[in-house]
Amino acid sequence: MDLATMLQNLVTEGGSIGWGLYYLGKLLGAGVAMGIGAIGPGVGEGNIGAHAMDAMARQPEMSGNLTTRMLLAMAVTESTGLYSLVVALILLFVLP
C-alpha cells in the first residue's frame, strides 16, 4: 500500500478529523521543506562571503574578479533554497 492510498483512506474514513490531519501534514511538510531547505543556502552563502572578503583583503587587485565569482557562487547556492520553495508550494497547492 503506497502513501497516497493510505492518505486517501485516512481522509475518507476519518471524516473531518481526517481532513484536518491531512492539511496539518501538508502544512508541516511545507514548513519543514522550507526550514531545512533554507539552512544550507544560508550557511553556504555566509561561507562564500567570508572567504571572498578574506581573499579581497589579501589581494585587493583581484577584487573585481572575486566579486563576480562570489556573486555567481551565491546564485548557484541560492538555487537550492528556491528548489525547496517550489517543493513547499507543490505540497501546499498542487497535491489534493
From Swiss-Prot:
Q: Which UniProt keywords apply?
A: ATP synthesis, Cell inner membrane, Cell membrane, CF(0), Hydrogen ion transport, Ion transport, Lipid-binding, Membrane, Transmembrane, Transmembrane helix, Transport
Question: Where's it found, cell-wise?
Answer: Cell inner membrane
As for family, the record states:
Belongs to the ATPase C chain family.
| Lineage of the species this protein comes from | Bacteria, Thermotogati, Thermotogota, Thermotogae, Petrotogales
- According to UniProt, residues marked as the site described as Reversibly protonated during proton transport are E78
Q: Which residues cross the membrane?
A: 28-50, 75-95
* Subunit organization: F-type ATPases have 2 components, F(1) - the catalytic core - and F(0) - the membrane proton channel. F(1) has five subunits: alpha(3), beta(3), gamma(1), delta(1), epsilon(1). F(0) has three main subunits: a(1), b(2) and c(10-14). The alpha and beta chains form an alternating ring which encloses part of the gamma chain. F(1) is attached to F(0) by a central stalk formed by the gamma and epsilon chains, while a peripheral stalk is formed by the delta and b chains.
> Record's Gene3D superfamilies?
F1F0 ATP synthase subunit C (1.20.20.10)
- Which residue stretches, if any, does this entry annotate as coiled coil? none
Its topology with respect to the membrane?
Multi-pass membrane protein
Entry-linked SUPFAM superfamilies = F1F0 ATP synthase subunit C
| Pfam entry (one) | ATP-synt_C
The protein depicted here goes by the name ATP synthase subunit c
Its cellular-component GO annotations read:
plasma membrane; proton-transporting ATP synthase complex; proton-transporting two-sector ATPase complex, proton-transporting domain
Molecular function terms, GO-annotated: lipid binding; proton-transporting ATP synthase activity, rotational mechanism
Explain the purpose of this protein: F(1)F(0) ATP synthase produces ATP from ADP in the presence of a proton or sodium gradient. F-type ATPases consist of two structural domains, F(1) containing the extramembraneous catalytic core and F(0) containing the membrane proton channel, linked together by a central stalk and a peripheral stalk. During catalysis, ATP synthesis in the catalytic domain of F(1) is coupled via a rotary mechanism of the central stalk subunits to proton translocation.
Key word Glycoprotein present: no
